[in-house]
Curated annotation (Swiss-Prot):
InterPro entries: PRR23 (IPR018903). Residues 214-241 have a biased composition (Pro residues). Residues 35-50 have a biased composition (Low complexity). This is Proline-rich protein 23A3. It comes from Mus musculus. Belongs to the PRR23 family. Residues 1-50, 161-196, 212-254 are annotated as: Disordered. Residues 243-254 have a biased composition (Basic residues). Pfam families: DUF2476.
Length: 254
């Protein structure tokens, strides 16, 4: 049997540690579920900012007036024949334009153009006034531009068609200062129709263009020898027969 030896008594017995109780933890605060505050109702756009004033243009014939019912009262508006009448009523601006100022063409003054074919109409828009340019101004402007362009093209063509006097006797190329290698009798004349694109014309042009420049060290290349149609090309060697291919096995899965 196994026996255990009793512990020997000592002067200083080992202290006996007793488990200490943990200190009470601070009480946790309860989180109260707070509902989000209700957002304030959005103010209506009409209350936030006043609406922009609206502008209307009315064209009146000579001797006519505009009648507007306002709070049970009929308001009669008649502009002078030589001026524009502007009236503001409850955030609405009305421009009364006489018929005489509708087609104003004075320099520095805008001309009012009516939209309706009758010549008198009203149009609502955010602009303070409506300005329109007549079609005659645009037509005249574009016509002058086209005439200037055509004159410039004619001058350019006349300059090339009639060379200066110092160049009329000699032959010059398109590059200024470089004489042309073509003599007067070699210069090809203008041709029309199929002659311009015929092979003979192209061949003569190539020969003339290959002429050497005077004083140039470069020499033209010799012409390529013409191939005789009677010459036969050497027969091609017979192709070697191909080796037979090996049979391939294919697996078919059902």
């Amino acid at each position: 049997m196994l026996r255990t030896r009793p512990r020997s008594p000592s002067a200083d017995p080992a202290p006996c540690w007793s488990p200490q109780t943990p200190a009470p933890s601070p009480a946790k605060r309860r989180r109260l579920h707070q509902e989000p505050a209700c957002p304030e109702p959005l103010a209506q756009p009409e209350l936030e900012a006043p609406a922009e004033p609206t502008t209307s243009v009315v064209f009146l014939a000579a001797g006519s007036a505009l009648q507007l019912p306002l709070d049970g009262v009929d308001l009669l508006l008649e502009p002078e024949p030589t001026s524009v009448l502007q009236v503001s009523l409850q955030g609405h601006t009305i421009l009364l334009v006489p018929e005489g100022l509708q087609d104003s063409t004075h320099f520095g003054q805008p001309g009012f153009v009516a939209i309706s074919p009758q010549g008198a109409a009203a149009q609502d828009g955010p602009q303070d006034h409506l300005v329109g340019l007549q079609e005659e101004t645009f037509c005249e402007y574009f016509y002058q531009e086209d005439v200037c362009d055509e004159d410039a093209d004619l001058e350019f063509l006349e300059h090339w068609a009639s060379p200066p006097d110092d160049q009329a006797n000699g032959n010059f190329s398109s590059i200024p200062g470089v004489p042309s290698p073509l003599s007067q009798d070699q210069v090809p004349g203008p041709s029309t129709g199929a002659e311009q694109y015929s092979p003979r014309f192209i061949w003569e042009l190539d020969i003339n263009m290959l002429g050497p420049f005077p004083g140039s060290p470069l020499q033209p290349l010799p012409p390529s020898p013409s191939r005789n149609p009677q010459e036969q090309l050497p027969p091609c060697p017979p192709c070697s027969p191909r080796a037979p291919r090996r049979a391939r096995k294919r697996l078919v899965y059902e």
